[in-house]
Amino acid sequence: MASNKINSLVARNTENAPKSIGPYSQTVAFSHYNNLSAQLPIDPKSGKIVAGGVKEQTEQCFKNIKAILESIDHVMNDVVRITVFVKNIKDVDTVDEVYKTFFPTYVPTRTTVAVAALPLNALVQIEALVSNGEGTIPNAPQAGNLIKLINNTANAPICSLSAQTVSFSHYNNLSAQLPIDPKTGRLITGGVKEQAQQCLKNIKAILNSIDVPFDDIVKINIFLKNLSDIEDVDEVYATFFPDSAIARAVAYVPARTIVAVSDLSMHALVQIEAVVSHGDGTPPQAIEDRHGIVINANNTENAPKNSLSTQTVAFSHYNHISAQLPIDPKTGKMIAGGVKEQAEQCLKNIKAILESISHGMEDVVKVNIFLKNITDSELVDEVYTTFFPGGIPARRTVGVSALQNDALIQIDVVVSNAEGTPLKA
């Protein structure tokens, strides 16, 4: 492959959206996707949170997303997935009213969770993943004529404000699934085990409806009301992954992130989101080309291992890394020290994973930071800038009520994969 045909990271910022409150870009495009930093309800003119309640704040978040998209010649209809973080789950109805005005006809996939804290004491923070049909090969824009495929099936819960699945190019994003029985539209009865099973059943039903195998999932995000329920969820999880005989033969499990939330819609105990490889592509990409792309899953001894998640799962031009806790891979235990030392260990683990697959921190497109104390952001940034001196990747920071191992911080990343994942001869 000629070097001039390789995608490169394109980080961009506009004056029409708030200046980042940390070392990160507003949007980073790579190949067929644009990863936006989570937007806070900041007025770009004043640099402060807008006056008013959750309605005004939601409006401002979406205005900021729209301004970023317009600055890169994109529109709201190019949004593939929206993630809404609220401080209070009761505010979701108000958020929805505003949401409809920005997505009057087409609706992307969506995840909504209530978290313990948001930067600047905001009531809402909204993040968008956006299609990028023109690609990012320097001086060689593609036709930009790829289309999104939107699907809904009656075999999974249907929502008027979100699509169950939106495919674009070689990825498929699913709306986070709640433990809703699609027949009744209500939460199923039972505890967290039954709920986790229903979430995964719903994901399976959505994938079945578009002829995509369950093992094509590359990344799973689990949102838990009580972090102590993780063992029960894991018990159910292990019955779903690996799914096929082929996946079992290689013990394939997707990359994974576990997030403690303060509340979920319908007061569910668990909600699960999936990112899926989509070998068929979307028109005009040819379906038969799928045979040339495979999932590459890797683990290294130099980072903490987990039997229920792979450290890095690459497919096509992206690489998904499991959330890293401040665990020393040599001892398998949490390192000593405060949030700075912990942030450094998380980033060291990420770096070790990337180096094991011949990548580096400069390939990171997006960083997700989960903090026990949102006020630790500045301390984290002191360490963060030593790993990302240019402050290039897009970023999202949320405050969580708890982290596994009583950690103070957890970090996961999305990474560019310029070489793709061709079938090895």
What are these regions (language model features)?
Residues M1-K63, A67-V80, V86-K201, A205-K219, ...:
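N-terminal presequence-like segments and the immediate start of the first folded domain
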